[in-house]
A protein has these predicted regions:
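Alpha/beta-hydrolase fold nucleophile elbow
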Residues: 30-40
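Short alpha-helix in the alpha/beta-hydrolase fold that links the catalytic acid
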Residues: 139-148
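Hydrolase active-site cap/lid region
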Residues: 55-103
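Catalytic nucleophile-loop/oxyanion-hole region of alpha/beta-hydrolase
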Residues: 3-28
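Short beta-strand/loop motif that positions the catalytic acidic residue
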Residues: 122-123, 129-131, 135
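Active-site nucleophile elbow and catalytic-triad environment of alpha/beta-hydrolase enzymes
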Residues: 100-120
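Catalytic histidine neighborhood in serine/cysteine hydrolases
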Residues: 150-165
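Acidic catalytic loop of the alpha/beta-hydrolase fold
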Residues: 134-138, 166
Length: 166
């Protein structure tokens, strides 16, 4: 994505990044309670952690949260031509602004296996979501969808009027 971490983005997927995050939590947080924070796709990875660390997570902060964006904001909106290219070549370089993002077919397929918006998280925790009203990448409605999966949480959505996705 946007970061400067080592490794090739094209070798990763939601399952891999979620598992790596879980390993880090086990190693460094151990059995302590913690707040989990995620931005954009990182919020999706953070939400996946509730499956393993639900009793330890005492709050969640999401910024421009983008769970399930691969299917809903990409695959469903791609033209047949783009879909065929991804299936045939295994990759499509998605141009957005000054960036080009290599979207692999394995990433799209893996995203479908990692749904988080269809399962309630019943923890009584603080959930704060921050989203830019001018976010053209991920609509504010995604943050509202996340709030719905936390029926027992103390929830807050902060919408930044001039905020975008970056």
């Amino acid at each position: 994505g946007h970061g400067k971490s080592s490794g090739k983005f094209t070798n990763g997927n939601i399952t891999k990044w979620s598992n790596e995050t879980s390993i880090l939590i086990k190693k460094y947080v151990k059995k302590n309670n913690f707040t989990i924070i995620g931005s954009s796709m990182g919020a999706w990875i953070a939400l996946k952690q509730f499956q393993k660390f639900k009793s330890q997570i005492n709050s969640f902060l999401g910024i421009g949260s983008a769970p399930e964006f691969l299917e809903n904001l990409m695959w469903k909106k791609f033209t047949k031509k783009i879909k065929n290219e991804i299936i045939k070549k295994g990759i499509y370089n998605l141009k957005h602004g000054n960036y080009e993002y290599p979207i692999t077919y394995q990433l799209i397929k893996d995203g479908k296996k990692n749904k988080v918006l269809n399962k309630k998280i019943t923890s009584k925790i603080n959930v704060t979501l921050i989203h830019g009203m001018k976010d053209e990448v991920v609509p504010v409605s995604y943050s509202r969808k996340i709030l719905k999966i936390f029926p027992n949480a103390n929830k807050k959505l902060i919408v930044i009027k001039r905020g975008d996705h970056s």
